[in-house]
């Protein structure tokens, strides 16, 4: 049953992404062997993550992969070499309350990404779930701007720009959405209090802040930058990861191109348990100790190439069912 009103109550059902190896044919021959190695290792890591999730009683769904997704995509506005890989469903899909939402991604390669999950979405709909999509954006050149990245001529919003907190819905537009996208969310989910968080958050919201439970948040930002309801919360401080992206062009030569890379995209099992990548034990021991002091258990999972993919454990998943409801948190 579709039910997600927060990002921290007990996780019962989830989508876990995968790697479509057929997309290797769209990769520059110069890098193809290295990318294949990364793809294969990542696929193995995802199998291990699925095993950990299932050991905790979580029902896990996986995308349906097809060679057809490597075909060239052509619309009246653009041409793209293949559908985006199915590694990070959280970027394009989210359950908001009792509604399965397909977002309006700013990436042209995501135009047909839902085909990976179509059978599952139909199944969830047949079980009684609600299912809606944002208007598919044209994503012509007019949708992009050098200064703000995205213009405001059509609604655009990655679903990774949403964070759920009971009757509140937090949303950011920086880099992966625009104001029309936020307004579409505001009108469509009018039973929620929609809170815009554009004061400082850049990139996907789930990679910037993480609500562990009411009263505790992981964040790199000063207290005054947070919404009013968070002003008295405990904050576990982190670094802003943005500087690492400046050397992204080197990632094919060095898979450790940003070893200090940290993002708060961490999947919660419940209010006291989060899934954290293995290498954080070595790279961020202070953070792990801070979590333990707050009574939060870190369950370590493998994901060797987080740096290369720029993904966290939340990015790799899409919650389908959590135990929480539309609570009103003080």
What are these regions (language model features)?
Residues 1-330:
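The feature marks the mature, well-folded catalytic cores of soluble enzymes
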């Amino acid at each position: 049953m579709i039910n997600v009103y927060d990002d921290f109550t007990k996780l019962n059902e989830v989508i876990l992404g995968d790697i479509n190896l057929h997309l290797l044919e769209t990769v520059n021959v110069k890098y193809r062997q290295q990318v294949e190695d990364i793809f294969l290792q990542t696929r193995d890591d995802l199998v291990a993550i699925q095993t950990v999730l299932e050991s905790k009683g979580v029902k896990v769904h996986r995308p349906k992969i097809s060679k057809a997704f490597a075909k060239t995509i052509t619309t009246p506005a653009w041409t793209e070499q293949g559908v985006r890989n199915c590694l990070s469903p959280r970027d394009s899909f989210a359950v908001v309350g009792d509604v399965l939402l397909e977002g309006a991604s700013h990436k042209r390669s995501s135009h047909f990404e839902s085909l990976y999950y179509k059978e599952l979405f139909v199944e969830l709909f047949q079980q009684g779930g609600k299912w809606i999509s944002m208007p598919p954006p044209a994503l012509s050149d007019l949708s992009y701007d050098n200064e703000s990245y995205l213009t405001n001529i059509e609604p655009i919003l990655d679903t990774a720009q949403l964070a759920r907190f009971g009757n509140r819905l937090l949303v950011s537009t920086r880099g992966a959405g625009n104001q029309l996208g936020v307004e579409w969310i505001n009108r469509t989910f009018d039973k929620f209090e929609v809170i815009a968080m554009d004061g400082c958050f850049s990139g996907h919201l789930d990679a910037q802040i993480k609500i562990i439970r009411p009263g505790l948040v992981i964040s790199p930002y000063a207290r005054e930058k947070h919404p009013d309801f968070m002003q008295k919360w405990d904050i576990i401080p982190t670094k802003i990861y943005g500087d690492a992206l400046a050397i992204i062009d080197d990632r094919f030569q060095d898979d450790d191109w940003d070893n200090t890379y940290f993002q708060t995209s961490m999947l919660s099992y419940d209010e006291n348990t989060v899934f954290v990548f293995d290498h954080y034990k070595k790279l961020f021991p202070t953070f792990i100790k801070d979590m333990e002091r707050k009574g939060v258990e870190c369950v370590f999972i493998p994901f060797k190439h987080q740096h290369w993919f720029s993904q966290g454990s939340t990015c790799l998943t899409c919650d389908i069912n959590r135990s929480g409801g539309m609570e009103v948190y003080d």
